[in-house]
């Protein structure tokens, strides 16, 4: 078994509850905002149409999932790059950056499959059931399906960025608590990016996705470079 297959097996084990977590959070979020919209007598448009409700629910799911994944990553492999534990990790033959890259990308790959499949399927089911529960939607079926897909992808990319930044700060400051606190702070700062897309064109959502993807790429490159160049003999090196 090569290192990639080994990391896939480990990731499936420590993220075994992620699918259930995403399902519960997303369905509960949709139900919550739908019920609130029904009792909103002032007629808030966001809470009374499919696009607004799915945007809000996807934002909540992204936020909780990001924090949960950072917690899992802290517990299962980020902690090994903090303090004296990192010395043993850097003795492995495949190299410090290669090991970390496989761990990080395998975790993000697992997250992407789980998040996209669940959020998109649940949102589509919600779209088809909107007539039954008397929720309006604008545009045709294809428009709404593209809208759901684009917002789900944006939420995932934003989540990737927050997770990678949290890991970077955690490793730089040598604290898993810092990583978790950073994830909470980033959710508060960036969470509204997805929620605010309910009223904008899919083209603009695509542009935001491209910018966030570029940001995540640069952050990931910096993080991997930092891991590679980290001097384990100097705890004060930044």
Feature map (PLM): residue ranges:
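Transmembrane alpha-helical segments in integral membrane proteins
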Residues: 65-81, 156-178
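Aromatic- and glycine-rich beta-strand/loop motifs that create alpha-glucan
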Residues: 1-23
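Membrane-helix interface segments
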Residues: 15-18, 95-96, 101-104, 175-180
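Helix-loop-helix units of permease transmembrane domains in multi-pass membrane transporters
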Residues: 76-108
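Hydrophobic alpha-helical transmembrane segments of multi-pass membrane transport proteins
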Residues: 57-87, 118, 214-219
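Terminal transmembrane helical anchor/hairpin motif
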Residues: 32-56, 138-139, 171-238
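Residue-level recognition of transmembrane alpha-helices
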Residues: 22-23, 103-104, 152, 183-184
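Secretory targeting signals
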Residues: 28-66, 105-167
